[in-house]
C-alpha cells in the first residue's frame, strides 16, 4: 500500500481551504465572544465512560476506542464535544448562575454520517447553562443564524422540533417506550413502512400519533394540525406552545416545523432545531435543549446549544479568504528588516521573495510591493 494514502473519508486540508477555515473560525469565535461566550478547550480523548454518558447507541458506535497504555483503561476519541462541555460546566466551573461557553476543535467518527462526509470534523459551537426559559433557546438559535450569515450563507431554513412530544407518548405507553430507539430511527429516517411495522401492536392513540409525526411538516400552521392529531396531553401542549413561540421570534430565516426531525433525540429534552441551505441535503448546523446531560457528572443544569462542522461550512461558504499581501525583496539590509517588521506589526502580510523565486505566490494576492525609493523603503501598488 502506498505510504501517502489516507483512510477512507479522511483528508488533508490544503493551504487555500485551511485559510478559509481559519478565517471562518476567527469570525465565528469573535461573534460568540460578542454575545458573552467564554471559550473552553476539552481534551481530544477521555475515559470512554465519560464520553458516553449521553447520546445513546449512536454516539457509542461513532466513537473510536483504544486502550490507555498508562492505566489500562479504555479511552475514547471524542465524536461530539457537547458532553465534554457539559462536564466542564457541571464539575469544573461549578457556577450557580448562567454560564455561556463556546468551543472549537476536531472530532472523529468511526463511520461517516453521509456518502461524502468526512470522519474528521472541525466542530464549533456554543452552549448556555443555567436558564430553563425559552429566552436561552431563542438566543442560541439567533447566534447560530448569525454564525451562518457571517459565513455568507443565504436562504437559510430553520427546522424546529421538540423532544417532549415523543417523550410524552413514550411516558404513557410502556410498549412504545420499550422500542424507543427503533422508533426514533424510523422517525428520523422518515421510514414509514418500518414505522408502521413497529406500531402495529401499539394502542390506537399511540399508534395514530406516532404515524402522524412524519406528516406533521410545514410552516407554523402545522402546529395547529398537530394539536388536532396528537393526544391532548399537557406535555405535548407545552411543547407545541414552545415551538410556536420560538418560530414567531425568527426574523431572518424561513421557519419550518418538522415533528419527526429527531436527530440527537437520545440526549435532547426540549426544543430541537436544524439549519438547512439550498443545494445541501443535510443540516449544516443543529442543536437543542439537553437539560439532563450534566446529571452524569453530578450536577444537572438547564442547557441548550448548537454546533456545526466548520470544514463543511467552509466548503459551501462564498467567503473569500485569499488575503492581500505585500511582496518584499530578500536583502541583508537593516532598514528593509525594520520596514518589514513594522508592516507585520501593523497586521500586514509581508512575503519576502527568496533569491530566484520572485514570482507571485498563488496563495496570496500580492497587490503591493515594498520598494526602495531614495534610500527609504515604501509600499507601492504592483
Swiss-Prot record:
Name of the protein this chain belongs to: ATP phosphoribosyltransferase regulatory subunit
Cited NCBIfam families: hisZ_biosyn_reg (TIGR00443), PRK12292.1-1 (NF008935), PRK12421.1 (NF009086)
Subcellular location: Cytoplasm
Its biological purpose: Required for the first step of histidine biosynthesis. May allow the feedback regulation of ATP phosphoribosyltransferase activity by histidine.
Assembly with partners or alone: Heteromultimer composed of HisG and HisZ subunits.
Note: This function is generally fulfilled by the C-terminal part of HisG, which is missing in some bacteria such as this one.
Assigned keywords, A-Z: Amino-acid biosynthesis, Cytoplasm, Histidine biosynthesis
Record GO biological process: histidyl-tRNA aminoacylation; L-histidine biosynthetic process
InterPro entries: aa-tRNA-synth_II/BPL/LPL (IPR045864), HisRS-like_core (IPR041715), HisRS/HisZ (IPR004516), HisZ (IPR004517)
A GO CC term attached to the entry: cytoplasm
Record's keyword annotation contains Kinase: no
GO molecular function: histidine-tRNA ligase activity
Top-level taxon of origin: Bacteria
Gene: hisZ
PANTHER family: HISTIDINE--TRNA LIGASE, MITOCHONDRIAL-RELATED, HISTIDYL-TRNA SYNTHETASE
Family: Belongs to the class-II aminoacyl-tRNA synthetase family. HisZ subfamily.
Gene3D superfamilies (alphabetical): Bira Bifunctional Protein, Domain 2
Keyword Nucleotidyltransferase: no
Alphabetized Pfam families for the sequence: tRNA-synt_His
Pathway linked to the protein: Amino-acid biosynthesis; L-histidine biosynthesis; L-histidine from 5-phospho-alpha-D-ribose 1-diphosphate: step 1/9
